[in-house]
Amino acid sequence: VFSLCSPLAQEQKLCPLMIEDEVDPEEFVEYKGKKIYMCCGSCVKKFKKDPDYYVKLTSNLLPQIEKGSLNKEVKFIDQKFCMVYADRVVSPKSYVHEHNGKKYYFWSSTAIRKFKAKPDFYIEKAKKNSNLKKLALKK
């Protein structure tokens, strides 16, 4: 539910961390003088751990952020989404688990536990994740 007093929330429809969830106008962070809306308090906390990364990664979902203001020093990790929760973005500061010599990033410790139980299933599932096109990243 959006109120008339939050015009930015009307422009930004989706949470930049849980990219399939609608924003809650009461859950937001200030970033370089702009309000970025989230779907919940958990996303607010995660966002604050790596704001420049999340803004650059999900700038396509944030119409209030000018593309020229993105931090050019931020380098993306290869993995963009949690291996278990495919609609949740990860950053270099996310939970990490190594499997067969490769690092994988996760939304939570619960996601790591699920991954450990069926790693091959989640690795195959991640290869089919269609959420990447929502980020519209330039190569």
Question: Residue ranges of each PLM-predicted region?
Answer:
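Bacterial N-terminal signal peptides
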Residues: 1-3
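Intrinsically disordered, low-complexity terminal tails/loops enriched in metal-binding residues
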Residues: 5-139
